[in-house]
Amino acid sequence: MSGDEMIFDPTMSKKKKKKKKPFMLDEEGDAQTEETQPSETKEVEPEPTEEKDVDADEEDSRKKDASDDLDDLNFFNQKKKKKKTKKIFDIDEAEEAIKDVKIESDAQEPAEPEDDLDIMLGNKKKKKKNVKFPEEDEILEKDEALEDEDSKKDDGISFSSQTAWAGSERDYTYEELLNRVFNIMREKNPDMVAGEKRKFVMKPPQVVRVGTKKTSFVNFTDICKLLHRQPKHLLAFLLAELGTSGSIDGNNQLVIKGRFQQKQIENVLRRYIKEYVTCHTCRSPDTILQKDTRLYFLQCETCHSRCSVASIKTGFQAVTGKRAQLRAKAN
């Protein structure tokens, strides 16, 4: 830089900073900027009223711009939801309306409400009918009439002792023979007609332990007499069912090898009575056991039925030794 330019000139006046004025409009509507305004070197003090008017105009313009922006946004969005006005419920008005309704209903009621109520209730609830039971005389009369009708019908079936085909040459039917059989059974067994069945009563077996490995059946002979069976037959059945061996001693007591309780011997005796004592037809204990050509037959003394009975089979016996096996095969 040259020396002339660097010299300080005291006569030069200092430049004053210009105040920034806001955007203003003229009366004609033309925008007035800083360039249009005359540049003044001197400070001009604006009046306070003019500044206030300018500030108010600025605020109004800002509010308008904000409202325009909000309108644009609302155009894209849905319309603003209107708040629903809440209706206030008035208790006094409701009570008056209820009173009016009651007065109208009372005025509409008929003069005779009881008859209508009876009609309505009669449809819904059915009255119970009084059931009258017939008297004994009427029942007896009906029974007699039915008996007369049955007697008129000639079925050829009679429950008397005389046979229906006695005075005629016709053949008897199956039903007539069946009725005759039942009549004979009723005559010979009056207990069965009354509905009472004879119970077979037997003494319980008396079992005593003999030593450590034997059992004694004390009243064995007494039970054989009650059952009307031979001791040999009952002994063979007991030994076969228990799977052991035994014999009768001098006191007529059965001595069995092994330990047995009273319940076990009772179960064996029940099976023997069911198979070899009671009749398979009428369940009567009055029977006789007969042997005919290696078969046993059970004959009943009440119904005179006769049926075969299974023979007593011993249990499985293991054969030991080679010679015993050869003998068993040879036999």
Swiss-Prot record:
It comes from the Eukaryota. GO terms for cellular component: cytosol; eukaryotic translation initiation factor 2 complex; synapse. Eukaryotic translation initiation factor 2 eIF2 is a heterotrimeric complex composed of an alpha (EIF2S1), a beta (EIF2S2) and a gamma (EIF2S3) chain. eIF2 is member of the 43S pre-initiation complex (43S PIC). eIF2 forms a complex with at least CELF1/CUGBP1, CALR, CALR3, EIF2S1, EIF2S2, HSP90B1 and HSPA5. Interacts with BZW2/5MP1. Interacts with EIF5. The modification N6-acetyllysine is found at residues 263, 291. Belongs to the eIF-2-beta/eIF-5 family. A zinc finger (C4-type) spans 279-303. One of its GO terms (biological process) is male germ cell proliferation. Residues 13-22 have a biased composition (Basic residues). Its main location: cytoplasm. The gene is Eif2s2. There is a cross-link at residue 102 (Glycyl lysine isopeptide (Lys-Gly) (interchain with G-Cter in SUMO2)). It comes from Mus musculus (Mouse). This is Eukaryotic translation initiation factor 2 subunit 2. It is found in: Cytoplasm, Cytosol. One of its GO terms (molecular function) is zinc ion binding. Residues 40-51 have a biased composition (Basic and acidic residues). It holds the Pfam family eIF-5_eIF-2B. Residues 1-75, 97-120 are annotated as: Disordered. The modification Phosphothreonine is found at residue 36. Component of the eIF2 complex that functions in the early steps of protein synthesis by forming a ternary complex with GTP and initiator tRNA. This complex binds to a 40S ribosomal subunit, followed by mRNA binding to form the 43S pre-initiation complex (43S PIC). Junction of the 60S ribosomal subunit to form the 80S initiation complex is preceded by hydrolysis of the GTP bound to eIF2 and release of an eIF2-GDP binary complex. In order for eIF2 to recycle and catalyze another round of initiation, the GDP bound to eIF2 must exchange with GTP by way of a reaction catalyzed by eIF2B. Residues 106-118 have a biased composition (Acidic residues). SMART domains: eIF2B_5. Keywords: Acetylation, Cytoplasm, Initiation factor, Isopeptide bond, Metal-binding, Phosphoprotein, Protein biosynthesis, Ubl conjugation, Zinc, Zinc-finger. The modification Phosphoserine is found at residues 2, 13, 67, 105, 158, 216. InterPro entries: IF2/IF5, Transl_init_fac_IF2/IF5_dom, Transl_init_fac_IF2/IF5_N, Transl_init_fac_IF2/IF5_Zn-bd.
